[in-house]
Amino acid sequence: MGVVMLSESGTAAFFERIEAALQRAGIAPVHIRHTAGDAIPASALADADVLLAYGHFRCTEEVMRAAPRLRAVVSPWVGTDGFDMEAATRLGIAVVNGQPDEHTQGMAEATVMMILAASYGLPQARHTMESGAARPAEPVAELLAGKTLGIVGLGQIGRRVAALLANWDITLKAHDPFARDVPDGIELLPLDDLLRTSDIVTLHMLLTEQTRHLIDATRLRLMKPDAILINTARGGLIDETALFQAMSSGHLRGAALDVFETEPLPMDSPLRRLPNILLTPHMIGQTKQSRAALVDLAVANVGALMSGTLPKTLRNRTVAETWLRRWADT
């Protein structure tokens, strides 16, 4: 079976670590260094049974049809934003991602850090230091105790955030239309009700056509005056123009963003001018431990697929029966 790896400049070093680990496992992948936006020669995919690609690669139906042997598309990260899930399922192709526990823990810890930083006015403090202004006469920090936290998305990371904060004397609310077995102590609400009643809102949803600009101007207006918005999930979940307007008008007290609609965040983005926003370059939660675990899981997932086993991190679960039948027929 053939394994093709597809990396771009920002991910090449990480993919080289995966390549070396695959080779140690007895798998010899073909590693293609790709420039985002460029077409991939059909010949490069002709013998691919498994395609290991960076998550925002545009893996369209056309790309998948160019690989007649293709059984699976694998992202070593959580994100599979660029993969056409519907087409993959229709073609009997498994879509697999990587989310080891180390990644979940790192993202949850980092989210709590962002919540605390925004609550305690760290962005304002940095702005004061950089501008040379005097220390404010009145504190901007507010205790987290006694606040209401709204968690949008109760997947692994959202649940871990809730678990980390369970004993912090805060009220936990959540919105997730697909949630099952909601942990004790969390009140499940419709999104608009959560926004109206939460002091801090943190996003943990996947980016789909349905969730793009989930937080738009209308929903920002629903949020409490002086509320805080946290996003460590996907930039496209928030309408950044509407967010700038909500913050510059004073409606929101603060925000902390690790992800953006365009990455890296353009230097002329108006968000950069706000003194009460914490911006980080899509690196929050990425630890040495999680990076090593992502490599190990990518190798394990590829190995499982090559042996005819669907990994636990299968994203399009409805493909399972078709996929196993395709495997049995070869």
Label the predicted regions.
Residues 102, 125-160, 187, 323:
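Glycine-rich NAD(P)-binding loop of Rossmann-like domains
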Residues 1, 70, 145-148, 217, ...:
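Phosphate-coordination loops involved in phosphoryl transfer and adenosine-cofactor binding
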Residues 96, 226-330:
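Rossmann-like dinucleotide-binding domain for NAD(H)/NADP(H)
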Residues 1-50, 169, 306, 322-330:
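N-terminal glycine-/charge-rich "phosphate-binding" loop or analogous flexible N-terminal tail
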Residues 108-127, 166-170, 297-304, 309:
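Oxidoreductase and adenylate-handling cofactor-binding alpha/beta cores
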Residues 43-50, 68-71, 196-201, 224-227:
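Short acidic/histidine-rich motifs immediately flanking catalytic phosphotransfer sites
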